Swiss-Prot record:
Membrane-protein topology: Multi-pass membrane protein
TM annotation in the entry: 4-24, 43-63, 86-106, 173-193, 200-220, 233-253, 266-286, 295-315
Transmembrane is among the record's keywords: yes
Entry function: Transporter for the divalent cation Zn(2+). Mediates the influx of Zn(2+) into cells from extracellular space. Controls Zn(2+) accumulation into dentate gyrus granule cells in the hippocampus. Mediates Zn(2+) reuptake from the secreted milk within the alveolar lumen.
Extracellular side: 1-3, 64-85, 194-199, 254-265, 316-317
Positions carrying Phosphoserine: 125, 129
Cytoplasmic side: 25-42, 107-172, 221-232, 287-294
Organism: Rattus norvegicus
Protein name (record): Zinc transporter ZIP3
Compartment annotation: Cell membrane; Apical cell membrane
Catalytic activity: Zn(2+)(in) = Zn(2+)(out)
Biological process annotations from GO: cell morphogenesis; embryonic cranial skeleton morphogenesis; in utero embryonic development; limb development; T cell homeostasis; zinc ion transmembrane transport; zinc ion transport
Superkingdom of origin organism: Eukaryota
Length: 317
């Protein structure tokens, strides 16, 4: 078994357990404590911004060069030469496809939240308000007993209503898994399709940071919404398996070693790059940098995240 294959298998196992622990630990240990939630939100917000910097470097320093190299190999097989920026165009197609899928899912769910983000800690606060913690996690007076109160005319919060997810029904569960994991499969594909060890390591760090934070946000949401542990475990296992599934698909495509597999690899890596763009700019930076608290510190963590991954690519781990 080659070292590259071993690295990818370890990535599959690592991401799965990071996400599983991140989503289940809050269900077990977090109580409905406002001050604890306040502190957790600030720490995770900084980690999320650091993850945004990691994803920037992953996208532009690791994944984009890989897509260019793969496309060049495919074009050389057909003796085709062009100066058109095919890699960049493919990534933008992936970006628009991810936006379309997200909006399609949310349209059918008749809701307006993003897939999952740290606004789960801030549901119900007015957009751009000075305080990120104006609305409590648990409603007062018995009306709103979950993390997410009913929306009002003056409420701009967009948290994911995980209270409904504990109810039985395969269609509801399928809708949830698709909403949370559509882009996770493409992140896994990007890992599985890589042919160089240092790019696998760079992508793994970026994916692990982001998806672990996603899992923690999901776990805290389930804890606040009193989702039963058994249902939370089923949900956590299902969501955590999405990136390993993507890695496995990528491994299968890459191992075929044919012209068709090379074309598929180039196309899928380009589309996966668009998913990374979506996560970086619309899920992380757009939401973290619009808040008025700790803005300069968040910029510092953004630069640090980028520098760490850019340095790893430069040193060719």
């Amino acid at each position: 078994m080659s070292q590259l294959l071993v690295a990818k298998v370890l990535c599959m196992v690592g991401v799965f357990f990071f996400m599983l622990l991140g989503s289940l630990l809050p269900v077990k240990v977090i109580e409905a404590d406002f001050e604890k939630a306040h502190r957790s939100k600030k720490v995770l917000s900084l980690c999320n911004t650091f993850g945004g910097g990691v994803f920037l470097a992953t996208c532009f320093n690791a994944l984009l060069p890989a897509v260019r190299d793969k496309l060049q190999q495919v074009l050389s097989l057909g003796h085709i030469s062009t100066d058109y920026p095919l890699a960049e165009t493919l990534m933008m197609v992936g970006f628009f496809l991810t936006v379309f899928v997200e909006q399609l899912v949310l349209t059918f769910r008749r809701e307006r939240p993003p897939f999952i983000d740290l606004e789960t800690f801030n549901a119900g606060s007015d957009a751009g308000s000075d305080s990120e913690y104006e609305s409590p996690f648990v409603g007062v007076g018995g009306r709103n007993h979950g993390l997410y109160p009913e929306p009002t005319a003056h409420s701009h919060g967009t948290g994911l209503r995980l209270r409904e997810l504990g109810r039985p029904g395969p269609l509801r569960l399928l809708s949830l898994v698709f909403a949370l994991s559509a882009h996770s499969v493409f992140e896994g594909l990007a890992l599985g399709l890589q042919e160089e060890g240092e790019r696998v390591v760079s992508l793994f760090v970026g994916v692990a940071v982001h998806e672990t934070l996603v899992a923690v946000a999901l776990g805290i949401s389930m804890a606040r919404s009193a989702v039963p542990l058994r249902d939370a475990a089923k949900l956590a296992v299902t969501v955590s398996a999405m990136i390993p599934v993507g890695i496995g698909l990528g491994l299968g495509i890459e191992s075929a070693r044919s012209v068709a597999s090379s074309v598929a690899s180039a196309l899928l890596q380009g589309l996966a790059g668009g998913t990374f763009l979506f996560v970086t700019f619309l899920e992380i930076l757009a939401k973290e940098l619009e808040e008025r608290s700790e803005q300069l510190l968040k910029v510092l963590f953004l630069v640090l995240g980028y520098a760490v991954l850019a340095g790893m690519v430069f040193l060719k781990w």
